[in-house]
Each structure stands twice: as C-alpha cells, then as structure tokens.
Amino acid sequence: MAFPIPARQLFIDGEWREPIKKNRIPVINPSTEEIIGDIPAATAEDVEVAVVAARRAFRRNNWSATSGAHRATYLRAIAAKITEKKDHFVKLETIDSGKPFDEAVLDIDDVASCFEYFAGQAEALDGKQKAPVTLPMERFKSHVLRQPLGVVGLISPWNYPLLMATWKIAPALAAGCTAVLKPSELASVTCLEFGEVCNEVGLPPGVLNILTGLGPDAGAPLVSHPDVDKIAFTGSSATGSKVMASAAQLVKPVTLELGGKSPIVVFEDVDIDKVVEWTIFGCFWTNGQICSATSRLLVHESIAAEFVDKLVKWTKNIKISDPFEEGCRLGPVISKGQYDKIMKFISTAKSEGATILYGGSRPEHLKKGYYIEPTIVTDISTSMQIWKEEVFGPVLCVKTFSSEDEAIALANDTEYGLAAAVFSNDLERCERITKALEVGAVWVNCSQPCFVQAPWGGIKRSGFGRELGEWGIQNYLNIKQVTQDISDEPWGWYKSP
C-alpha cells in the first residue's frame, strides 16, 4: 500500500529544524524493501541544542513549577489529538514498522490511553505534595515534596515505536520534567509526527524535543550529556550496558528495559487448543519482535505430543501477508539486518542438532520484504544458542518437563528476567510457580497482555526500574525531605557565650 511519509526535520524548542550537518537517513518499508522517504539524522551538535532548549523550558515557570492539574490539561489534549488523528498514525506505524494493521490500531489506542492515564497521575501528584512525615520529636515537623528530576533523555525502541516512546514521554511530562526523545532510527516516523501534535495542543516550546538519528551519533551524546539528569532506555541488553556505563561516569540515574528470553510453562491439566492459541500469540505477536516474547515453551511431557501437533496446525493457519491486508497476523521483521540475524539463529539451531519442526524460511508467496515464517524448533538442549539468546523474531523453541521443580528450573535457566507465563487449571500451583519465577511480570493462563495501570520491567539482565502505573511517574520525581523546627526554645546543644 502506497502511503506518503511526511517530510519532517528535527523537533527542537517547538520548531522543525534541519540537522546541523544536514544529513538524512532513508526510511525503508520492510514489506517491500523500498525506500519510501527519509528522516533527519541528528548528531552531537543537535543534541546540544535540544538539551539547552529542554533546560530553558524546565527553568521557565510554565511547566516544571506548575501544578500537576495544569500539566494534565496538555496530556489530555494530546490524548484527544492522537485519537482524532488515529487513522493517520496507524497507517504510518504500519508502513514504517511492518506490524499488522490491526496491531497498529491497538498501539495507537494505547498511546491515547497512556496520556489519559498519566494526566490522572499528574493530578494525583498535587494531592501528595507536602505529605506529612510522623517524627518522634514534637519540636520538629516534616513533609515530603515530589519534584521533577529535570531534563530527561528518553531512548525508545522500534518494535512499538510511538507506544513505547509514550511510556516514557507521558510520565516524564506528568512529573514536570522536560525531555529529549531519541527514537530508534529503524522506526521513527510516528515519533516525529508526534512533534506536530505537541504544537497543535500548544505544548510549551522545549518541553519535548525529538531527535531522530543513529545511536552512536545521537543516542550516545544524549546519554553522556552533563546537563541531562536521567536516562530512560528501552532496547537490547548490550546497548543497555553501554548506556549504564556512560551514565555512571556522571552518577546519572537510569532505568533500563532490556532483552528477554521468557518461558511459557504449560501443565497437563489445560485446555490444549486454548493454550496453543495463547502460545502462538505470546511468541508471534508483533512479528515475534517483543522483548517479553514467551519464546521458550515448556510443556508437560504427558501432553507434549498432542500439544505440539496442534501447535503446528495453528501456526500453519497464521496469515502472513502485507500488513495492510485484512486479517494479516504476521508481517515482515523490521529490517534486512534483523532478517539476517534471525535466519542465522535458525541455521545455528540446525547445526547444533535442533529440529526445525515448522517454518524457518521465507514464505514462498512473498518474494519481497523481510518476511520469515513462524518457526517452531524442537529437540532443544539447554546449551544451544536458540535456548539461551534472544532472537527477537518469530521463533519458538520447545522443551518438555516432567515435574513442577524441573519446570521451574528450566524456566529460570536464563540470564534474563523480564516476563513469564504459566498455564494450569490448578490456581494454587500457578501461585507457587509465580512466586518461584525470577521475572518482573508473570501472566497466569495468558501471555502478553499489558496495561498502563500495572508496572512493567524486569530483573537480572532484563534491566531494572519500572515503567507504567503509579510506578512510572516515580521514575521522574525527586523526593525531597523538608524538616522545620517549630519550637521557640533554643536548641541548647552548645553553652551560650
């Protein structure tokens, strides 16, 4: 489907500005491999201009020093404007990222919902200011202020381009911070378009600045900038480590939402067809490009044969097509680089002795685009690369277990700790498994539902900190203790001269 990509510049201080070095990055439609436009390529010089604008906006009295209720009016206006322009954003997200149109619809709905939710959090912040602290000495009284951290750098990924940027923008702005957003260069179009929304609702200049560009050229200078007070990053564990190391030089706080290799544990007492659908959804949703993808299937040995047989039948029924086609449930992966990486994972699995039970190739009916069949890999050992490393593509590996203890051990056999799913009709067993799983989120009898009201984040090498919910806004607040002596009496520690 042909759809024009708007020609945009960098969004700095409420204006569209050409990059200082005037470079551009081509936008490639992953469904066709065709160049459909370009985006500006920011460098360290542009980062400097954007950070100065954000700091100036933070020091003005029309944002950070205002009430949460005042900021909430802007967040609600943004939510309304996103809803008004929903069709435009959905089309751009689909053509830029390759995700199925129906998924992009849900994403953009969630963008609006996220701004609406954090508008409420901004208002709630007003009621929490000057919260009293009970002290053991009557001559003192104490309270707590919740104040914005300052200028924050937000680095977002390409799998949910505008939505995961929103997970950072909305709470940061609700808290009263000003921000510089650096989205992934692989899918930046909707994030740039968001700058136009900011202007349309009258967001004060400099409150949000949007820089597209390559990680080393724009992301790294943002992380290391001495006038950026915090970094919130979503991306790979390897890049997250670099972000953390760079920020550490300035003792700069970071929140990191990184990779995963999440397990899905299926016990013998389940409705197999129901769980099979959740299994393919948990791994193949968003074209398999989900940090929380439950890509390690652990199924009880007593039902494994029947389960895997139905798994293949359901997987064969997935419609793989141009993302704009009605009923599309699997589109292309994001780029040629990602395509090659996934195919290398599959070939390595074969060479290590695994069986590609289904898929593993380009769909025969799609000659162009970065399409990969949904792939099921069996005969897995825990030493294999496919078991240990994040693929970030539509690849599911399958292993059996015989006992609850074995299931827990296999599920936790990973350096990651983002999410996990457990399926059983025995809810007491589900509760035991939930407590034992070393992750930040557990789905019981489902996989992947995510709500703005609930916290999101991982442990181990999946990062730290929590986005969304009431925890999301806390990432962007400084908690300040204020203690006052209310006695007329002298302190009396030293002898009076």
UniProtKB/Swiss-Prot annotation:
Induction: Induced by salt stress. The record marks 159 as: Transition state stabilizer. K(+) 2 binds at residues 251, 460. K(+) 1 binds at residues 28, 96, 186. One of its GO terms (molecular function) is 3-aminopropanal dehydrogenase (NAD+) activity. Belongs to the aldehyde dehydrogenase family. This is Aminoaldehyde dehydrogenase BADH. The gene is BADH.
